[in-house]
Amino acid sequence: MASDAPTGGSLADRISNPAETTEPVADKAQLDGAASNQGGSDLAEPEYNVEVKLSDLQADPNNPLYSVKNFEDLGLDPRILQGLSAMNFRKPSKIQERALPLLMGNPPKNLVGQSQSGTGKTAAFVLNILSRLDLSSEQAQKTPQALILAPTRELARQIVGVIQVMGKFLDGLHIGTAVPADTNARPTRMEASVVVGTPGTVMDMIKKRIMVAAKLKVIVLDEADNMLDQQGLGDQCIRVKALLPRDIQVVLFSATFPAHVHQYASKFAPAANELTLQHEELTVEGIKQLYLDCASEEDKYRTLVQLYGLLTVGSSIIFVKTRASAVEIERRMVAEGHTVASLTGGIEGSQRDQIIDQFRAGHAKVLITTNVLARGIDVSTVSMVINYDIPELHQPPNRPRQADFQTYLHRIGRTGRFGRVGVSISFVSNREEWEMLNQIQKYFNTDIQRIDTKDWDEVEDIIKKTIKNTRAQAGFR
């Protein structure tokens, strides 16, 4: 029966014969930022350094002018400072310390930044945009002055949410969205000071003169590496930019900078100041990583069902490889009386919005998804991520399977948004999957602890203790 406890796996024993343990491995000490009521920003940041490379090679990037320790030092509109306070931001995160002076200088300069989700980069580019808006007249308020391009409607909607909170005290701020929708639902004219959208829809609206681009001052391309991973989106962004004023400030953020992304960034944002995180920050510290041996694909499902009670302690995301898997797992679990939802790229846009909203509000505790959610979506209540299928790169049929390290990082980062800690559990059912897990351990120089499923009560006890311990280390109450 599907609800039976899964069989005890011993795949790792057979392959590498590791020493067994049922005690959670102690997390490395976390260097959390101060809580908001103690003058911090609720950003529990790991130690990392932000490196700056200026387009003006004669300038000193370590000059104090290129760093800021307090939002008040930026000369912001008091109403924007009120918005920051509403977000519990008391001081800049490390990336904001360096990014904000570069973004907000005059005359405006282009910026290319490397930053993962969860470091405060969205707030940084939104702050720059709000500080540059002219809201002095109704006509100005309803004329697009800033454009943000995102790879998915989910990320676009989340960015809109950040703008709404940060700009809630700005009279006359109008925010528009340009995402795939029923053509009949589109406005005949985009009347907004800030527009957030996906590249194809934005390009279509500009070409059809629904959106006027003549007054745009800033364009932001978020998640550039994710854009380039999706067929055609990178080219669409270039075509959108070609329709904009030549003197527009160009801001590009990307979580990773392999050669093709760096080349693209140089083309999209020429003569830009550059901001990068040193490699130490691009780690998975702060997230307790576990794995479970499963005897087969069917055993994966039985393991998932057995975990259901733990998944609903907070909110959980289950990542699978294909849309078909997400739909089938949802069907089986719902048939067995479990409350779950699935989210894939195949679901119509407004329905996807509804699913995300229900999950964010806590009405749905368990979400099954493909990589639609792996980047950029901030659901702060997520305490556990399940890698039902280990993420892997697309390889030719004759090549060995290769783990996708960046997707793994972004997946499990759902539990560690803004430095919060959480738990990730990967399922391993064959030698190839175990080898991909081992690749991940070596790449991130981290230990992923094996949990023996022979005694399921003990498995639950270990995971509960792990969740409790990681929350305690983060200062949760």
UniProtKB/Swiss-Prot annotation:
Residues 1-43 are annotated as: Disordered. Keywords: ATP-binding, Cytoplasm, Helicase, Hydrolase, Membrane, mRNA transport, Nuclear pore complex, Nucleotide-binding, Nucleus, Protein transport, RNA-binding, Translocation, Transport. One of its GO terms (biological process) is tRNA export from nucleus. GO terms for molecular function: ATP binding; ATP hydrolysis activity; inositol hexakisphosphate binding; mRNA binding; RNA helicase activity. Its main location: cytoplasm. InterPro entries: DEAD/DEAH_box_helicase_dom (IPR011545), Helicase_ATP-bd (IPR014001), Helicase_C-like (IPR001650), P-loop_NTPase (IPR027417), RNA-helicase_DEAD-box_CS (IPR000629), RNA_helicase_DEAD_Q_motif (IPR014014). Gene3D superfamilies: P-loop containing nucleotide triphosphate hydrolases. Its EC number is 3.6.4.13. It catalyses: ATP + H2O = ADP + phosphate + H(+). GO terms for cellular component: cellular bud tip; cytoplasmic stress granule; nuclear membrane; nuclear pore cytoplasmic filaments; nucleus. Coiled coil: none annotated. The keyword Nucleotide-binding applies. It holds the Pfam family DEAD. ATP binds at residues 115-122. A motif (Q motif) lies at residues 69-97. It is a peripheral membrane protein. The Q motif is unique to and characteristic of the DEAD box family of RNA helicases and controls ATP binding and hydrolysis. Associates with the nuclear pore complex. Belongs to the DEAD box helicase family. DDX19/DBP5 subfamily. This is ATP-dependent RNA helicase dbp5.
